[in-house]
């Protein structure tokens, strides 16, 4: 009887979308396609206060980590880790860019003007201020997705076979390369081409190790060419 009750509870959680998908259906990281004819430098975005349009070509020569963020997500704590990552790897040429989005569980419901105060006083709270650039809230999937996210998604295979629970995903049409949840990450290289894509549940510490490993390989190749 106890086992039956336990199984019933687990099924209810699965149907509600609170239990993670099988690890066999997802990968922590995917390498992006090579030989892309265009780069991220063809795009740009408005800062979260709406006062400045930043062309991404401004980051030429840098490694750029694109992250779709949300203030009321179970992964919002990653903000603190991303701050640490930005501080630690900035000397090696890493720039983190955050893009608030409300398409996953409606977990970024506020206006642009409310996002920074929410981060400071609510989640993560404790006076938290991101040390990386945040941009205006927008879509990363669907009919109104931002064009640079179309480019990133088409450049890199998805990390999971399944999109997730449809009643918690708010866009149409749904496509195989779509972002699965808040805090999915894309790394773009110094030449503007996408390199890696990470599953949202991949820890920031693992993302850091992957980035450092790639940087070391590139540095070694540079030495060999000399």
UniProtKB/Swiss-Prot annotation:
Protein name listed in UniProt: Glutathione peroxidase 3
Catalytic residues identified in the record: 73
The UniProt record lists the keyword Ion transport: no
Cellular-component GO terms for this entry: extracellular space
EC number of the protein: 1.11.1.9
Cited InterPro entries: Glutathione_peroxidase, GPX_AS, GPX_CS, Thioredoxin-like_sf
Signal peptide bounds: 1-24
Location relative to the cell: Secreted
Entry comment describing in which tissues the protein is expressed: Secreted in plasma.
Record has Signal as a keyword: yes
Cysteine pairings via disulfide bonds: none
Catalytic activity, as annotated: 2 glutathione + H2O2 = glutathione disulfide + 2 H2O; tert-butyl hydroperoxide + 2 glutathione = tert-butanol + glutathione disulfide + H2O
Enzyme class, UniProt record, top EC level: oxidoreductase
Annotated TM spans: none
GO biological process: hydrogen peroxide catabolic process; response to oxidative stress
Function: Protects cells and enzymes from oxidative damage, by catalyzing the reduction of hydrogen peroxide, lipid peroxides and organic hydroperoxide, by glutathione.
Organism expressing this protein natively: Hylobates lar
Keyword terms, alphabetized: Oxidoreductase, Peroxidase, Secreted, Selenocysteine, Signal
């Amino acid at each position: 009887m106890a086992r039956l009750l336990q199984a019933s509870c687990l099924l209810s959680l699965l149907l509600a979308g609170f239990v993670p998908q099988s690890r066999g259906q997802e990968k922590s990281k995917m390498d992006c396609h090579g030989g892309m004819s265009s780069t991220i430098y063809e795009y740009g975005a408005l800062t979260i206060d709406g006062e400045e349009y930043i062309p991404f070509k401004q980051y030429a020569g840098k490694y750029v980590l694109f992250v779709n963020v949300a203030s009321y997500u179970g992964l919002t704590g990653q903000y603190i880790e991303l701050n640490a990552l930005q501080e630690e790897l900035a000397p090696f040429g890493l720039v983190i860019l955050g893009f608030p989005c409300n398409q996953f569980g409606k977990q970024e419901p506020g206006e642009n003007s409310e996002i920074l105060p929410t981060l400071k006083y609510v989640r993560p709270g404790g006076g938290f201020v991101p040390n990386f650039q945040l941009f205006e809230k927008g879509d990363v999937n669907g009919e109104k997705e931002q064009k640079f996210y179309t480019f990133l998604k088409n450049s890199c295979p998805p990390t999971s076979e399944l999109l997730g629970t449809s009643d918690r995903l708010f866009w149409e049409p749904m496509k195989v390369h779509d972002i699965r949840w808040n805090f999915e990450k894309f790394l773009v290289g110094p030449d503007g081409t996408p390199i890696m894509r990470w599953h949202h549940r991949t820890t920031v510490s693992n993302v850091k190790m992957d980035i450092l490993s790639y940087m070391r390989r590139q540095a070694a190749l540079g030495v060999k060419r000399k």
